[in-house]
């Protein structure tokens, strides 16, 4: 059993070796074919170039002498032969180099296979790590070879064109920011100046108002002029209004409050309005009664009902009969006259009513009717 197993293992190893050798041979054959194809292409390209060169020389040498053209053709042929020989030698050298490289690759592959067979008994982790490192190293070496094989191509446009000069112009964004900062600074300065001017004007107005309130507005204005301060028309107007307020306060005893504009309010009219307000809203005293109020209260129409209605309409309070007895002789005479007048008015009203409603007159004409009214 042990011998059979050993023989089977050896047979498998020989089969794997044969397969790998066959693969290696096929790869070498492909590489050779590829290199031969490249060589043929290069030969064709060189031959095409030579044919073109010959055609150009034939065209250029038509008008020249035959002796010169023959000597040149001989020289050209000798040169072309030398070039072909040198190219063939370089191709042979390249082929020999490629063969040596292929041999080295085959040797390295066989060595790798032997190493893999030996390291199968070791741990899987080590085996994986080594295989990864080998694959990475192979890929890196291939990349290096490709880089070496590729010639460096320098772009003529980049080499010929000079580098652009550095920017020496103005930056518009920075200029705009600087201009904005300058404008803001100017606006701040102007605002500060205006605030200072307003404060100075207010101080001058306060000084003028205080001077006018003391009573000598003209003298104070003269003092301001003497001191050297500029007296504006506003200050002069404020001084005049302060003088008027002081005069109204001395006459009426009513001062204009500070929340009113002194230039827009007349102090005399304001004092009159305040007096009227006090008269309206103050409480009435019991003893104070005017003559007209007494006359309307004592008015008598000759009929008690009419007297009561009239007093209710006028808002007069009813008085006692005892108070009515104590009346002066003059007032009694006036009351009698009022009663007679009201009686005559009632009679005339009734006569006019009878004429208008019944359309009948007293007598034949207008005079008789008027006499009848008089007799009544």
Swiss-Prot record:
Record location of the Glycyl lysine isopeptide (Lys-Gly) (interchain with G-Cter in SUMO1) cross-link: 317
Protein's UniProt keywords contain Mitochondrion: no
UniProt keyword Transit peptide present: no
Cross-link Glycyl lysine isopeptide (Lys-Gly) (interchain with G-Cter in SUMO2) mapped to chain: 317
Alphabetical keyword list: Coiled coil, Isopeptide bond, Phosphoprotein, Ubl conjugation
Highest rank taxon of the organism: Eukaryota
Residues found modified as Phosphoserine: 45, 318
Coiled-coil ranges from the UniProt annotation: 171-214
Residue ranges, annotated region (Disordered): 1-171
Bias type Basic and acidic residues, positions: 13-52
InterPro entries per record: SMAP_dom
Basic residues biased stretches: 53-155
Family annotation (PANTHER family): ARGININE_SERINE-RICH COILED-COIL PROTEIN 2
Similarity annotation: Belongs to the RSRC2 family.
Name of the protein described by the UniProt record: Arginine/serine-rich coiled-coil protein 2
Lineage summary: Eukaryota, Metazoa, Chordata, Craniata, Vertebrata
């Amino acid at each position: 059993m042990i011998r059979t197993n050993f023989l089977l293992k050896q047979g498998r190893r020989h089969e794997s070796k044969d397969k790998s050798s066959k693969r290696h041979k096929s790869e070498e054959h492909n590489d050779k074919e590829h290199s031969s194809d490249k060589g043929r292409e290069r030969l064709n390209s060189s031959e095409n170039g030579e044919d073109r060169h010959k055609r150009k020389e034939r065209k250029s040498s038509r008008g020249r002498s035959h002796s010169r053209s023959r000597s040149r053709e001989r020289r050209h042929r000798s040169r072309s032969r030398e070039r072909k020989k040198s190219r063939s030698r370089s191709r042979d050298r390249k082929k020999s180099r490629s063969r040596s490289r292929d041999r080295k690759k085959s040797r390295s592959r066989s060595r790798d296979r032997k190493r893999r067979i030996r390291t199968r008994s070791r741990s899987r982790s080590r085996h994986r790590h080594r295989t990864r490192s080998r694959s990475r190293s192979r890929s890196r070496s291939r990349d290096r070879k490709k880089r070496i094989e590729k010639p460096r191509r320098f772009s003529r446009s980049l080499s010929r064109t000079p580098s652009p000069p550095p920017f020496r112009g103005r930056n518009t964004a920075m200029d705009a920011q600087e201009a904005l900062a300058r404008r803001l600074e100017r606006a701040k300065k102007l605002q500060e100046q205006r605030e200072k001017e307003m404060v100075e004007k207010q101080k001058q107005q306060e000084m003028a108002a205080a001077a006018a309130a003391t009573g000598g507005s003209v003298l104070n204005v003269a003092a301001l002029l003497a001191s050297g301060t500029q007296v504006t028309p506003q200050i002069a107007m404020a001084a005049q209004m302060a003088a008027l307020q002081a005069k109204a306060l001395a006459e009426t005893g009513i001062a204009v409050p500070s929340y009113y504009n002194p230039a827009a309010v007349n102090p005399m009219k304001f004092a009159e309005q305040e007096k009227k307000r006090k008269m309206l809203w103050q409480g009435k005293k019991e003893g104070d009664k005017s003559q007209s109020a007494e006359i309307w209260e004592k008015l008598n129409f000759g009929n008690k009902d009419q007297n009561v209605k009239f007093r209710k309409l006028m808002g007069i309070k009813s008085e006692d009969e005892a108070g009515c007895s104590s009346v002066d002789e003059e007032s009694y005479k006036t009351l009698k006259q009022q009663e007679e007048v009201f009686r005559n008015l009632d009679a005339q009203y009734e006569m006019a009513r009878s004429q208008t409603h019944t359309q009948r007159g007293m007598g034949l004409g207008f005079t008789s009717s008027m006499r009848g009214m008089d007799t009544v």
